[in-house]
């Protein structure tokens, strides 16, 4: 794993919004009183959602106090897991899976589309500052490869042309429909084969 460093530019303060605070308290109460520090990952996610898709150091310190947990322990969690962004990303944060199943099915064509429409390099903001992209490891939708995640939504069964159209919509302020772009429902077969024993259509 590459070394992950927090952004050099950091806000001085952070605190949960009313909605985030309610969500955090709800999660913490699900743990025994002596195990509530186990909620740290969920609270980091809440902080990231509130703060435009990235977690500043001030948020880590705030969560440490919230959970009565040493700041360094929160920092260790946030810097270890790659789903936590340690520097500003776009409002539309695009993650392209390039693990083996997606790679075999053309994931790097999706990367080409991101380079053309957003920025030449990963983790760079688009010209209008609204989007950024990066390659990631498996997102768990291998059967619908290649795919990418935009914020909380999955876009599956893609190729370069379809990806370019999705990115054009995002850049123009539209919200593209998530899901399969081959018309599949969830992960149903692409042909008429419905069982492993249906050898005629294999």
Q: Where in this protein do the model-derived segments appear?
A:
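Signature of N-terminal electron-transfer/Fe-S-associated modules in redox systems
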Residues: 1-202
